[in-house]
């Protein structure tokens, strides 16, 4: 995402349709712990095809907007991941991430094997920009930071929120450092 770029080379790699797909929702007590866990997960070569992070307060906006509830409303943040590939790869990668997540402060590890629940969870995630726009005069903006600095950036946003009194929410693509 962005508007300032010069493309000098483009490579396209086609991959076959995955045999299996599994999304998981991983709640954490706070966003800092969740973001730090993402770095561990990415270093483990578990190859998630989606890695999203969301603060609880933005999830609450999405829940009201969509009329759907996330599990573990006691969580301060969530990481939403998807694994695609051969069945045995998906199972092994999810098991590896489960272990890492729980070792790194996850409150739970929820496999979204029920198609309806998975669709609802992703529908809320997909509607977060619209949910924020519905309660805000400001248009959400995208900021990209190095993945290793995402937690620092979110901390800065939270400090700015406390100082200014303006409500700010954080969510985005944890796998590439894109913060909405």
Where are these predicted regions, by residue range?
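Noncatalytic alpha-helical scaffold of FAD-dependent oxidoreductases
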Residues: 1-180
């Amino acid at each position: 995402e962005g508007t300032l770029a010069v493309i000098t080379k483009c490579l396209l790699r086609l991959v076959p349709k995955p045999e299996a797909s599994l999304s998981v929702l991983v709640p954490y007590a706070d966003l800092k712990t969740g973001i730090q866990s993402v770095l561990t997960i990415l270093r483990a070569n578990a190859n998630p095809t989606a890695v999203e992070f969301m603060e609880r307060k933005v999830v609450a906006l999405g829940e009201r907007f969509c009329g759907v509830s996330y599990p573990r409303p006691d969580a301060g943040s969530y990481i939403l991941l998807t694994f695609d590939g051969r069945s045995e790869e998906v199972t092994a990668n999810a098991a590896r991430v489960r272990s890492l997540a729980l070792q790194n402060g996850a409150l739970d590890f929820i496999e979204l094997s029920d198609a309806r629940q998975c669709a609802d969870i992703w529908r809320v995630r997909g509607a977060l920009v619209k949910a924020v726009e519905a309660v805000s005069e400001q248009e959400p903006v995208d900021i990209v930071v190095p993945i290793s600095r995402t937690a620092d950036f979110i901390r800065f946003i939270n400090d700015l929120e406390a100082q200014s009194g303006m409500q700010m929410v954080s969510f985005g693509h944890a796998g590439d450092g894109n913060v909405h």
